[in-house]
């Protein structure tokens, strides 16, 4: 009995250290051999919440006492404290008891039967996946060290895979292909933009553990095969693709008729700004008289990369965006002449002083919207220093910023929303998007948006 009392005392002490609300009595869970089943855990947690007996942290200590012995409480609570101090979205964190119950139920439903409950790391990962899933931020992710390395590799522009760019469709809980790299493995196998990935190697997304895990299954060693199941306009299709080493080019360009420079930016990755510079230099050498920047289906990427590219277009010391962390004063990014390392840097105070047109659509999001809104604001909203017309459709409307925080002991990370951001005009567009100057709906039979962009560039040149 003394041992049990010491155990309970230790649990209470740990709860006091990490809890942000009043400490309440935690009853002895009894005989774990008899009661440590997922049904008992679920029932006891639900009863706990209904009776308002415990605060948020207590539920997890209670869960541990009911038979899930080996999760890393220090790691879990470290991440919880990061969320509490930094999370800045909507009304903030949800009600702690409700969130706790949802997290436990999600853990039981999705992980309890599929993990080794004696594996400390596996249990902790599962709890943190569930924690983040239920926080209320659709842009929040928990990643293990391996998953985070894969994520960084993807944003570096080099990775092993099949040559597609995707985004998570939250409404349909599936993965939308928004770009297929020309002449890549997926392109050769027949995958298309607009396909919805619903399975990999015979397993559904739920069976794979969700969005991030599904992406990890698509990737693999070059030369190996993967079968991707897609929904194409209601038809279920299995397509086998042979993986290859993918070096992604996020910027493509060409000189159109009348010497109109066309630059397509598919995402904002580590190597995108350098590629953009090369594209502009090449088109300048070809005598471009104006530019069309195409950011349709661009889901965003690194804010810093968007700032670097804008720095190559606008003069120095122009505000690009402002943002504000929880409890802190407002900060801002400005254009600069030394934004990248020297080996691929934007050297010198380069300015594009030719007419410009941007093409955007409903999948232009996040950092891509920073690009659109900042240039728009310098066409008369805050200063009138460029000639610009925006063509296409209303953008996605993601006017928030996510940051990533790591746990140094094992390399895992959490990413979640930390601030809203505003373009130079200081008008946030989250949930609203950016309206084009000239609305043109995309037509699958042709590219009416590009045709109109060419028309608008001609108008600007003839003013």
For the regions a protein language model found, what residue spans apply to each?
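Conserved PDZ fold ligand-binding element
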Residues: 84-85, 186-210, 291-294, 378, ...
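Gly/Ser/Thr-rich loop/hinge elements
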Residues: 150-152, 236, 247-251, 300-359, ...
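Terminal peptide-recognition signature
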Residues: 59, 127, 131, 164, ...
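C-terminal, low-ordered peptide segments at domain boundaries
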Residues: 181, 187-192, 199-289, 311, ...
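PDZ/PDZ-like domain segments forming the peptide/carboxylate-binding groove
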Residues: 147, 155-199, 203-207, 269-273, ...
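Extended, small/polar residue-biased N-terminal targeting/export presequences
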Residues: 53, 64-171, 225-226, 233-240, ...
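Bacterial signal peptide processing site
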Residues: 24-27
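C-terminal motif of bacterial Sec signal peptides marking the signal peptidase cleavage site
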Residues: 19-22
